Amino acid sequence: MFSLPALLIGACAFAAAAVAASGDGCRAGCSLAIAAYYFSEGSNLTFIATIFAIGGGGYQALLPYNPAITNPDYVVTGDRVLVPFPCSCLGLPAAPASTFLAGAIPYPLPLPRGGGDTYDAVAANYADLTTAAWLEATNAYPPGRIPGGDGRVNVTINCSCGDERVSPRYGLFLTYPLWDGETLESVAAQYGFSSPAEMELIRRYNPGMGGVSGKGIVFIPVKDPNGSYHPLKSGGMGNSLSGGAIAGIVIACIAIFIVAIWLIIMFYRWQKFRKATSRPSPEETSHLDDASQAEGIKVERSIEFSYEEIFNATQGFSMEHKIGQGGFGSVYYAELRGEKTAIKKMGMQATQEFLAELKVLTHVHHLNLVRLIGYCVENCLFLVYEFIDNGNLSQHLQRTGYAPLSWATRVQIALDSARGLEYLHEHVVPVYVHRDIKSANILLDKDFRAKIADFGLAKLTEVGSMSQSLSTRVAGTFGYMPPEARYGEVSPKVDVYAFGVVLYELLSAKQAIVRSSESVSESKGLVFLFEEALSAPNPTEALDELIDPSLQGDYPVDSALKIASLAKSCTHEEPGMRPTMRSVVVALMALTANTDLRDMDYHPF
């Protein structure tokens, strides 16, 4: 029944594929890479120099890379501070043969800001340049608690040294985490790459990132402080496996072969036991047995699709069917079993995020929450949702191919979204916190009714009650995150804050972070702009300057002022001073009662 030589060949092939796929297969790193650090409120150059272990002059060493900083004591919030660091060829502790390019920055413990001793707390200081999951994978400490004292954490920040298959001209690269509204193309243009040929080159350095907005890390060639590009070092990069990787393949295939022999023995023993006890065949169990046995996960409420069915429906995941790209995977449109669907495709490394979203969406069912249809766990992880065919709120507000929204439509969208959040916060046990509420995650159907989407991707957290706060990793989108989020504190009031920002977006049609120029150095948050207007001697007049001009004055001024005041309450700096979503729904229902919704039957395109 089983061929041992075939098993050995298969084991070696599997090991080789696993090693080749799990890392870059790098042979060497490069002496220099640059990180684009998002400068947030409370940061300073000394702190940045400390967490990047920059010696020999401290923050002074940062100044040659940041000529725009003329006063080290004053850096505008939202600016990117460029930080040099060495880019090395590293191996994962659990699989040394799996190599990848990253900076390994020694992080002293206890933490400089104090009070944190988890990977979440460490990652929170690096403004999306790394994640808690990445730190856990590249360090030996358990995730629950990192010992203090003289210990240290190696902070791994992905980097690039170039690729000889793309161009020999570039060997110095910027590691740039995208924030809301940014894309690979916009960042590349900011650093001088704007022609079609240059953009094609940048996309080759960043496969799969074209058009992605606000999520993920991109690599951009940059000049050194002398204004010169570093050429790629000859032979410094490549995809051939290192000697360590080859050794790893040999060891892995032997180990897999031994395990295979053990499994064969156990299989025959199990068959005998099965015959004696008349137990059912294991083939009756699904790929998610372990997940379905976990508390609260009820996959029987969703359809399990086959990989073949999804592959055929998307025409082999063709670009014609691709409708989106996120930090954890791609989204495709397809018709499955007569229903229009949106299919999120994730790698196996996103198992935790996949299970989190599956757990939530098999529990919650509401008109204003996107509906999960099914899933698949063959080859990759797939979540299948209902397809919402009128885009998202951000697209309508930015008018990317859409006509302006009427005032009545905006008020109804606000109420729909608030009801979805109220359901999560008030009517589900345990309570769920979305953690990434924003206009891009509010989908609109053909009748302009709103549905909240994007629950997974590690942005969903259970809490025991409305008053309880849970410390976890930082997640969310810049511009929508409340002050407490930077310390990993999560409660339903995090969603309330983000919803307040969405209300400001509905009023102004501006993005959560407003740039007064192409440079990120002149950026202000909507929260700041509206608070400034509401504190003016004549709030109504100041507010009129922020209201979306496409409304052409066709809105009730008193209602606009009430929504702005409600948004201000939602974005209060103190979580305890923010209203509950139930209170927000009541306030918006009162507004809709006074708003003429007859034009909701008219849908401009």
Swiss-Prot record:
Active site per the UniProt annotation: D436 (proton acceptor)
Molecular functions per Gene Ontology: ATP binding; chitin binding; protein serine kinase activity; protein serine/threonine kinase activity; transmembrane receptor protein kinase activity
Cytoplasmic side of membrane: 267-605
Domain of life of the organism encoding this protein: Eukaryota
Matches recorded under SUPFAM superfamilies: Protein kinase-like (PK-like) (SSF56112)
Catalytic reaction(s) noted: L-seryl-[protein] + ATP = O-phospho-L-seryl-[protein] + ADP + H(+); L-threonyl-[protein] + ATP = O-phospho-L-threonyl-[protein] + ADP + H(+)
Chief place where the protein resides: membrane
Membrane-spanning segments: 246-266
Name listed for the protein in its UniProt record: LysM domain receptor-like kinase 10
Organism lineage string: Eukaryota, Viridiplantae, Streptophyta, Embryophyta, Tracheophyta
Gene giving rise to this polypeptide: RLK10
